[in-house]
Amino acid sequence: MRQVLNTPYWYNKEERIPKKLCEEIIEICKEYEMDEAGVFGANEKDKLMNTSYRQTNIAWIPKGTVVEKLLHSHVGLANMQAAWNFTVTDMEAAQFAEYTKGHFYDWHKDVALNPATPHRKLSISVNLSDPKDYEGGDL
């Protein structure tokens, strides 16, 4: 198998988003309609439910919002600093996930080739809660 990247497969930004900003992002995202998460598909029609694999509630963050722009800027920064230098032409709508007691998202790889999302090259995870307040979330 030919190696595509000579750089790391992940990028971890040690600098944290300030706690106050995290709290504001949570408040903004809780205003969006929350729904039970599926494991694949960009819309309700394509959503597959598999509660042995993923159990959480999510909201879609609309494009053009302050939160989406903040995430997009972090993706661009990681793309440059990790020296991936992908040409990012578009981003899927980001998800805000709320994990309550008993909720989880098991280990997985985003490897499905989906003709509807040929631009999908990078993923971002931002933990907004204090790590002392939950178990898991490791990448």
Where are the predicted features?
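Fe(II)/2-oxoglutarate oxygenase catalytic core
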Residues: 1-139
